[in-house]
Each structure stands twice: as structure tokens, then as C-alpha cells.
Amino acid sequence: MSETPSVSERAILDTSVIIAADVAPIPGVLAISAITVAELQFGVLVAKSADVRAERLRRLSLLQQHFDALPVDEAVAISYGRLAAAVVATGRQPRRRVMDLLIAATAHAHGARLYTRNPDDFAGLENLIEICAV
């Protein structure tokens, strides 16, 4: 019987962490959002050269072998609403941040920390989710 990881152990990796080559090991039970897979798939499809496309596809395939992406389900949708409202409360608009907010909502719904290279993308969410800059 496996134990469910505690909230303090769970961590979602933002796309910025996945694409970085110089990130130190991150502790915890790590996961990614299906949104990260979408962003990386987009990167494959818009690559300017066949070599870049092949390398991005190789990295995406490795990522998909290593992680089962967490889906955008009803719990994530509810979390998204809360996070988007928090962004509006800070005077910003959530529309330009939909992908980032969906990744953050995945972390929120799963009671996980969010690791990112771009903590400013998640400004205003600090009271709802633990944002860890790497």
C-alpha cells in the first residue's frame, strides 16, 4: 500500500523549469500539468528548423515517458476561477496569463507547490499557492 504524498512533498513544475537546462534538483513528488505538454507541443510545431523540431520532440517524448501529466479536470477548473479572480483583484487581467494560471490551478487543486523560473508571472497568487522560484 503506497502512501499519499503530503502537501509539503507535492510539487508541480512550470514549463519554464522543464525547458531550463540549468535547474538544480528539486525535492518532492514532482508532477507536470497537461498545460505544460500543450506548451511544449506548440514549441515543437512552430520550430524554425527540422533540427530544432527534432530536439524539442525528443525532449517532449522523454518528458512524457517520465511524467504522467495531471489533467485539467473540474477541480483544476474551480481552482482556475479562484486564481483568475485573485489576479483581477490585483488590477491585472488573467487573459494574457491563461496558460500560467492553468498550471498554477493544477498545483492549487492538488495542494502542491509550484516551481517556476518566472515568479512574476504568478504575482498576486502568493496567498493561495506556494510559488518557489528556481
Say what each PLM segment does:
Residues V17:
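Short, glycine/acidic-enriched loop or turn micro-motifs at the edges of active sites
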Residues S2-A11, A21-A105, R113, A123-V134:
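PIN-domain endoribonuclease scaffold, especially VapC-family toxins
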